[in-house]
């Protein structure tokens, strides 16, 4: 592989997933066209005029990358592994084999090349084969009673299994029953393909979510679309995106002098910068689209139409949220590219062996949960900013939300440091942790940079926390705005 192919392959895999998601969306739209052409036209209009339009440009760019880069990519391996995804799963069996029983059949369908590890234990000596009538004469694996036979990559124990297997034949020649336990872990030969269905599902989910909001809450969606379109047209949005792109590219070539840990510094700096830019965009938009419209009596004109105050606030919040999504998508893709390239770049600068593309993929895939958590943190601060904007202008809004951002990251530290100390300080720390969002839960850049993986359960709880706190902030915004005199 060329160096370009090495660092581009991880992004190409994600691009393939996005392309598959786009094809699924086109198929769904085609079915809708056959069933209800009016609904299909409405969907096409929604994609063409809302926030989905710039997102669609990004999707088309990813599809072009997936198509143009295919000749230099391991397409055959990727396709073969994709086909095998439904067939790989842990194999677990606990059986009792009668005394002097030969060729006891245990269903176990796997490929030897896909084995990640396996352990076979028995309280009696048994012979394990993949063919019948071998027994103890030609045993493939001989398991001693009370001594587990374990294999994993790099272990001194031979794997023994070769080719494909559908059944294990176990022979027990002892005079006592044998209790046998089998545990096998398998995975496709290119496990990186698991990112393809996730990318496809994320693409489909984003479009479906936007269309559901549009058709289930049309008035709210109109306000959200107008706010999002106005936000994207602002020079600030373009400026922040350009600053992010230039900074992310520059981070690759900045010498951090970390003795081989420059990739970690790049990941930490990049995630923090994207999050801060998104928060700045959210605070500015909330101030201009909510506070300024209230002060300029534009909100009074909007509410004179059949639009309620609740629809106005929720629409403004969604209108702020969609540009943040777009910013994370654009800067996130650039960030993934720079991290993947940084792995190859550092190896070249340090005169090390050229890394495999799987190493680039590993660094890339680890930062995606960090980007998700950064986005959830931005959502919380956007909701708080909307609530503050219903009563205060831009400058107080920026000061309050900036203070909440700082205290939200320090609340957990204050509580820990005040344990067993002054009662008043401990009380203030606990009060801050209850009232303010504990943003420290979303601050895991150090763990991600240190090659730690983020479990899906953690992302799930973070999503629930973000939804609940954002919902509470929007509820507070509705209370503030309900009795606000707009005249």
Where are these predicted regions, by residue range?
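Secretory targeting signals
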Residues: 4-24, 30-34, 197-202, 206-208, ...
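Alpha-helical transmembrane segments of multi-pass membrane transporters/translocases
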Residues: 10-33, 55-63, 67-71, 191-207, ...
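Juxtamembrane interface at the cytosolic side of transmembrane helices
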Residues: 26-49, 206-232, 482-486
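Helix-loop-helix units of permease transmembrane domains in multi-pass membrane transporters
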Residues: 41-52, 224-229, 290-319, 481
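Transmembrane helix segments
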Residues: 56-74, 243, 247-257, 360, ...
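Beta-strand-enriched, solvent-exposed domains that form extended recognition/catalytic surfaces
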Residues: 68-195, 199
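Membrane-interface helix starts
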Residues: 229-242, 395-396
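Residue-level recognition of transmembrane alpha-helices
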Residues: 241-244, 316-317, 324-325, 329, ...
């Amino acid at each position: 592989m060329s160096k370009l192919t090495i660092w581009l392959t991880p992004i190409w895999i994600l691009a393939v997933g996005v392309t598959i998601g786009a094809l699924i969306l086109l198929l769904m739209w085609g079915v809708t066209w056959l069933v209800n052409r009016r609904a299909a036209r409405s969907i096409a209009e929604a994609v063409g005029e809302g926030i989905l339009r710039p997102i669609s440009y990004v999707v088309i760019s990813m599809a072009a990358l997936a198509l143009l880069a295919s000749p230099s990519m391991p397409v055959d391996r990727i396709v073969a592994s994709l086909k095998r995804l439904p067939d790989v799963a842990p194999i677990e069996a606990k059986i009792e084999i009668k005394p002097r029983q030969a060729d006891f059949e245990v269903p176990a369908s796997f490929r030897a090349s896909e084995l990640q590890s396996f352990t076979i234990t028995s309280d009696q000596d048994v012979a394990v084969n993949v063919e019948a009538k071998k027994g103890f004469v030609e045993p493939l694996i001989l398991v001693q009673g009370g001594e587990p036979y374990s294999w994993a990559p790099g272990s001194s124990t031979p794997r023994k299994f070769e080719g494909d297997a559908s059944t294990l034949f176990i022979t027990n020649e002892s005079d006592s029953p044998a209790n046998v336990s089998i545990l096998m872990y398998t995975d496709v030969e290119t496990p990186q393909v698991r990112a393809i269905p996730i990318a496809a599902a994320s693409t489909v989910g984003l479009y479906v979510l936007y269309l559901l909001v549009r058709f289930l809450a049309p008035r709210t969606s109109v306000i959200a679309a107008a706010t999002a379109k106005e936000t994207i047209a602002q020079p600030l949005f373009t400026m922040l995106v350009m600053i992010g792109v230039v900074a992310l590219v520059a981070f690759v070539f900045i010498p951090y002098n970390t003795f081989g840990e420059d990739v970690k510094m790049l990941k930490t700096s990049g995630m923090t910068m994207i999050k801060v830019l998104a928060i700045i965009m959210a605070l500015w938009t909330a101030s201009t689209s909510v506070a300024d419209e209230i002060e300029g009596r534009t909100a009074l004109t909007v509410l004179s139409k059949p639009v309620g105050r609740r629809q106005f606030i929720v629409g403004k919040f969604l209108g702020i949220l969609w540009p943040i999504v777009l910013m994370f998508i654009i800067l996130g893709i650039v960030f993934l590219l720079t991290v993947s390239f940084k792995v190859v770049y550092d190896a070249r600068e340090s005169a090390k062996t050229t890394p495999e593309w799987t190493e680039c993929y590993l660094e890339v895939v680890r930062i995606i949960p960090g980007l998700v958590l950064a986005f959830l943190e931005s959502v919380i601060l956007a909701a708080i900013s909307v609530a503050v904007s219903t009563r205060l202008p831009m400058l107080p809004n920026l000061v309050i939300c900036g203070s909440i951002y700082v205290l939200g990251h320090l609340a957990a530290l204050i509580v820990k440091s005040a344990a067993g100390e002054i009662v008043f300080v401990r009380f203030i720390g606990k009060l801050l942790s209850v009232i303010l969002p504990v943003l420290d839960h979303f601050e895991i850049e150090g763990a991600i940079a240190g090659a730690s993986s983020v479990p899906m359960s953690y992302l799930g709880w973070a999503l629930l926390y973000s939804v609940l706190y954002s919902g509470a902030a929007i509820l507070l915004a509705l209370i503030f705005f309900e009795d606000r005199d707009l005249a």
